[in-house]
């Protein structure tokens, strides 16, 4: 241990260590265990982390194979040097559940948390592969909806995570297109009455700094680039006219290992 260093310097040094290594070190002493669970330290460590890329082939795969799907790329230095044959050995915890040992695909990533669908489309699962922590969430109409994980972007050390649900079918379909949001702090879904279903998603969503982005279309067929801001009481929607790319390559999910704790009401998930 770094026993001879001031605590603030020790914390600064440890914040530069990859989260996967910190996870193995957390039982070294009580002080480090507490430090690695401190939201301020976790956020600082996340800000210094290298980004990896998960290749998602959209077919069901066992989560025991998750490590074979990860290609390590440090996006901070990608402009200067990039060799796709070079990777970092990142070993993550597998998803352990005998009833659902496969997921259909990874939906989105936010702060080291992966939002996934199970093969039977009965539930969502939020999963931190670095810590092994999971949270199961009941959801309906998963074949007809798009989901994205995000949070309210504020100056607090601990983010308030949410899941946004939009329909992917036009309004004249028989599908329920009401927008919904899942609050981790309350463990419940609620309908966003103030969000008009004037458009529907036509692409997978991505999350950046807590906000959601995707291509959408209104009922006349006009394509838009949509940005969703997660707010304390719901969401704010901003759109601009844009052309969806004619060709989409393999679906990729960027991923950064982190020590973020999944909250469940006032408790942490297992």
UniProtKB/Swiss-Prot annotation:
SMART domains: FBOX. It comes from the Eukaryota. Signal peptide: none annotated. Residues 1-45 form the F-box domain. It holds the Pfam family F-box. PANTHER family: BNACNNG10540D PROTEIN, F-BOX PROTEIN CPR30-LIKE. This is Putative F-box protein At3g24700. It comes from Arabidopsis thaliana. The lineage of its organism: Eukaryota, Viridiplantae, Streptophyta, Embryophyta, Tracheophyta.
């Amino acid at each position: 241990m770094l026993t001879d260093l001031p605590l603030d310097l020790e914390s600064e040094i440890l914040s530069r260590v990859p989260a996967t290594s910190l996870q193995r070190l957390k039982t070294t002493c009580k002080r480090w265990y507490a430090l690695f669970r401190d939201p301020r330290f976790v956020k600082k460590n996340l800000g210094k982390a290298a980004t990896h890329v998960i290749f998602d082939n959209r077919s069901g795969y066992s989560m025991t194979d998750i490590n074979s799907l990860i290609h390590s790329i440090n996006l901070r230095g990608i402009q200067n040097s990039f060799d796709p044959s070079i990777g970092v050995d990142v070993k993550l915890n597998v998803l352990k559940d005998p009833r659902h040992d496969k997921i259909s695909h990874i939906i989105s990533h936010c702060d080291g948390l992966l939002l996934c669908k199970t093969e039977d489309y009965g539930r969502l699962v939020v999963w931190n592969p670095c810590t092994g922590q999971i949270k199961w969430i009941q959801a309906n109409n998963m074949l007809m909806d798009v989901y994205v994980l995000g949070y309210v972007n504020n100056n607090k050390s601990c983010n308030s995570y949410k899941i946004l649900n939009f329909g992917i079918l036009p309004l004249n379909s028989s599908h329920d297109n009401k927008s919904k949001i899942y609050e981790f702090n309350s463990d419940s879904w609620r309908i966003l009455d103030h969000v008009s279903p004037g458009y529907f998603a036509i692409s997978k969503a991505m999350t950046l700094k807590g906000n959601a982005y995707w291509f959408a279309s209104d009922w006349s067929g006009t394509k838009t680039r949509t940005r969703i801001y997660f707010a304390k009481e719901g969401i704010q929607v901003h759109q601009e006219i844009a052309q969806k790319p004619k060709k989409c390559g393999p679906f990729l999910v960027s991923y950064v290992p982190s020590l973020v704790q999944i909250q469940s009401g006032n408790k942490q998930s297992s």
